[in-house]
Regions:
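Conserved double-stranded beta-helix
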Residues: 93-103, 112-175
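Catalytic phosphate/metal-binding cores of nucleic-acid and nucleotide-processing enzymes, i.e., regions
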Residues: 35-52, 128, 135, 174, ...
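A structural signal for short, well-ordered beta-strand segments and their strand-loop junctions
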Residues: 51-53, 130-132, 202-203, 224
Length: 289
């Protein structure tokens, strides 16, 4: 919810004149005073996205980058040796959004980052939030993320750059090349947003279409930290799990039923705005670096 909605529950029902008067009356409240509201929160409220430089430091990003690489190598070993495993525990290579790349839901260390980031996220968005889940991937050469929007459990999302290997890209022609995420704003503007390890984008994934063009580099690791508005339409703490750190199999039947309905309703609304294509997707594993 917006800054004012925290205090005035029928905010959307007020006229523009009433809203202006309420803002004037609340100027003395430090929680609403523009002088103490984080600049990122002001930008986020207007644009529905904001980039945060160095949300985590480079050393932490590098640690998590190597953690993801090790997870991918471990899963690759299990597959090559034909050892039976659980995708909930070890991750998968067949996520249809990034087919062939390593992906994992609700990893304990990433869910810990999700939880520890909550207070800062509330400051950066001026919104009361509940954490839902984390999801991370190790993208590889040629991966393309098609233009899409997210499901309701990703109401307010972050994509945090952990690290990458672009050593195969010709630095003399493309110095300091990185892999931007594109966001389409409501006015149709298409923005490439560049990130270095530790940088993060906060965005309303259900409202804004976003995508990436094919990756030139060898690999690129990102973690998504997903939150919902506390008390809002999509308020399902922990994505329906009893605690953070559990895999998706622990989502309750009640939450799945509610989530499926919310997904369907949102998809119907989005379908009126965007046309999607049905494609055959190859989910075979790609080369792991």
């Amino acid at each position: 919810m917006s800054i004012m909605k925290k205090y005035i529950h029928n905010w959307d029902e007020l006229t523009a004149e009433q809203q202006a008067k309420a803002k004037e009356q609340f100027k003395g409240n430090p929680g609403l005073n523009a002088s103490v509201v984080h600049p990122a929160a002001k930008f986020f409220e207007e644009h529905k996205w904001v980039k945060i430089d160095r949300f985590i430091d480079r050393n932490m990003a590098n640690l998590l980058y190597h953690h993801v690489q090790l997870e991918a190598a471990r899963l690759n070993y299990l597959e090559e040796k034909n050892i039976e495993y659980s995708g909930d525990t070890y991750g998968i290579f067949n996520d249809t959004q990034a087919p062939g790349d390593f992906s994992k839901y609700g990893d304990p260390i990433m869910d810990t980052l999700l939880s520890l980031s909550l207070e800062q996220m509330q400051t950066l968005t001026a919104t009361e939030l509940v954490p839902t889940y984390s999801y991370h991937r190790l993208y590889t050469t040629g991966t393309e993320l098609e233009r899409h929007s997210d499901r309701p459990s990703c109401e307010i999302s972050t994509t945090l750059c952990l690290g990458y290997d672009n050593s195969n890209v010709d630095a003399s022609r493309y110095p300091d090349w990185d892999w931007p995420m594109y966001i389409e704003e409501k006015d149709g503007t298409k923005l490439p947003i560049h990130m270095k390890p530790g940088d993060m984008i906060i965005y309303r994934g259900c409202d804004l279409k976003h995508w990436r063009e094919p990756l030139w580099g060898k690999n690129h690791a990102q973690v998504f930290l997903h939150y919902n508005e506390k008390g809002g339409e999509y308020d399902i703490p922990y994505d329906g799990r009893p605690l953070l750190g559990f895999d998706a199999s622990f989502r309750s039947e009640e939450s799945l039923t509610r989530q499926n309905k919310l997904d369907k309703d949102l998809q119907e609304r989005q379908a009126k705005e965007y046309v999607t294509e049905n494609k055959v997707i190859d989910t075979s594993k790609k080369v792991i670096y």
